[in-house]
Each structure stands twice: as structure tokens, then as C-alpha cells.
From Swiss-Prot:
Involved pathway(s): Pyrimidine metabolism; CTP biosynthesis via de novo pathway; UDP from UMP (UMPK route): step 1/1
Alphabetized Pfam families for the sequence: AA_kinase
Role noted for this protein: Catalyzes the reversible phosphorylation of UMP to UDP.
Gene Ontology CC entries for this record: cytosol
Residues given in the record as ATP binding sites: 17-20, 60, 64, 167, 173, 176
NCBIfam families: pyrH_bact
Protein name: Uridylate kinase
This protein's record includes keyword Transferase: yes
Regulation acting on activity, per entry: Inhibited by UTP.
UniProt record similarity statement: Belongs to the UMP kinase family.
Length: 244
């Protein structure tokens, strides 16, 4: 049963990471409006109980650089194109949130005057305190860094209590549960266990960044009803990665 509006959240400020692929929903490419609307509803539930929400969205639903890089495209060019894809996703999510009457700001790591604001940490924290959702896009603004790394970086910068990584499975497994029937799910892991077992939940840079700054990460199934709000009020969902 979902928590009531009177429920006290365990986390006051969270950084939610959505993959670009998650926005595709049942489509093969692009953005499924039904997914946007559902995420807007779930984020609205968090705002409703007083949780401050920062958001990072990947760009894999619109651009995947690996195939082009394999064909000879420069890596930096491909990464810049990927950053632009995250801006497009951020604009789509902002639109969905604002249609749900949720005040939202989009901040880009690369200047895009007239389209979105440039990232400003102090301004972002002020906006979060005022109850606005803040969407951080364009990754870190640098090539060679994933949006998982960007999510962890922004989470640390805005003093979030936890990074919530939304995926298509309900946590971290010993193997890919889509391919290996007897894959074991972990309820809790340390950063070092993730690295030693090469579990691949996030890239090395992202996990090391969280480890060095003590930022807990919870991996959960974004398609499970009420999973997001359950986590925020302290219920067990998915896998928690933290210090040992």
C-alpha cells in the first residue's frame, strides 16, 4: 500500500537518475509520453511529502555513440552529441512535470542561452529548497564521463541524502537476471564489493566518486508501482550500496 501524504520521508533531498532507455517505454526509439506522465506523477508524490528532487536523465533513447564511434566518429564528438540528447530529454520531462503543476528548472552543464539555464550549484540548491524539481542535463559538460557519473557528481554537489538509480530490474544481481535464471539479487552491497565483483551497476568513476564521498546509492525497478515513494519513506526496495 502506498504511503499516505502524512508520511515522514527518510530522505529530505534525493538525486534521481533515469536512463534514457527507460523513457522509451514500449517504443524502440525516442520518448514514450506515458512514461513521462507516470514519472511526473511519481515525482509529484515526493514533492507532496516535502522531498526535494534533483533529476538526471541519460540520452540513450535518442543517441547511442558507440556504433558511430566504431565506424570512425571521434569520441569527443559522439559524447557531445550524447550531451545534447540529455538536454532534449530534460526539456520533455520538464514539460510533463509542468503540465502536472510541478515547478521545474532545467540546468545544463554546457551554456545554452535561451533554451535552458547554465548550471549553478547555489541557485540549484535554492530552487530545491523552494520546492522546485531541478533537472541537470548535458552530463558533467565533459566528454568521457557517463550520465551515471554526472548523477553522482550532482548528488554530491547538492548535498543529496541518496542517489536513486532507476532501472528495469529490481536491484543489483550477481548476473544479468534477464539472461541468467539463477542470478542472485543483493539487498545490500558495499562500494568495494560492487567494484571487486564487477557487477556493472554503474561505471567505475561513478562508484568511486560515491565511495570517496560516502554517497549511498539505491538501485530499484522504476516500473514497480510505488517503489520510488516507498524508498523515500524508508521501506526496502531494490539494492542499497553504501559503506561497509
Amino acid at each position: 500500500m502506498p504511503p499516505s501524504a502524512q508520511t515522514q520521508p527518510k530522505y529530505k533531498r534525493v538525486l534521481l537518475k533515469l536512463s534514457g532507455e527507460a523513457l522509451m517505454g514500449e517504443e524502440n526509439f525516442g520518448i514514450d509520453p506515458k512514461v513521462l506522465n507516470r514519472m511526473a506523477l511519481e515525482i509529484g508524490q515526493l514533492i507532496g511529502i516535502g522531498v526535494q528532487v534533483g533529476l538526471v536523465i541519460g540520452g540513450g533513447n535518442l543517441f547511442r555513440g558507440k556504433a558511430l564511434q566504431d565506424a570512425g566518429m571521434d569520441r569527443v564528438t559522439g559524447d557531445h552529441m550524447g550531451m545534447l540528447a540529455t538536454v532534449m530529454n530534460a526539456l520533455a520531462m520538464r514539460d510533463a512535470l509542468e503540465r502536472s503543476n510541478i515547478a521545474t528548472r532545467v540546468m545544463s552543464a554546457i551554456p545554452m542561452s535561451g533554451v535552458v539555464e547554465h548550471y549553478d550549484r547555489r541557485r540549484a540548491i535554492r530552487d530545491l529548497k523552494e520546492g522546485d524539481v531541478v533537472i541537470f542535463c548535458a552530463g558533467t559538460g565533459n566528454p568521457f564521463f557517463t550520465t551515471d557519473s554526472a548523477a553522482c557528481l550532482r548528488g554530491i554537489e547538492i548535498d543529496a541524502d541518496v542517489v536513486l538509480k532507476a532501472t528495469k530490474v529490481d536491484g543489483v544481481y550477481s548476473d544479468d537476471p534477464m539472461k541468467v535464471a539463477d542470478a542472485v539479487k543483493y539487498d545490500r552491497l558495499t562500494y568495494d564489493e560492487v567494484l571487486e565483483r564487477k557487477l556493472g551497476v554503474m561505471d567505475l568513476t561513478a562508484i568511486c566518486l560515491c565511495r570517496d564521498h560516502g554517497m549511498p546509492v539505491r538501485v530499484f525497478d522504476m516500473n514497480k508501482a510505488s517503489a520510488l515513494i516507498n524508498i523515500v519513506v524508508g521501506m526496502e526496495e531494490g539494492t542499497l550500496i553504501e559503506r561497509g
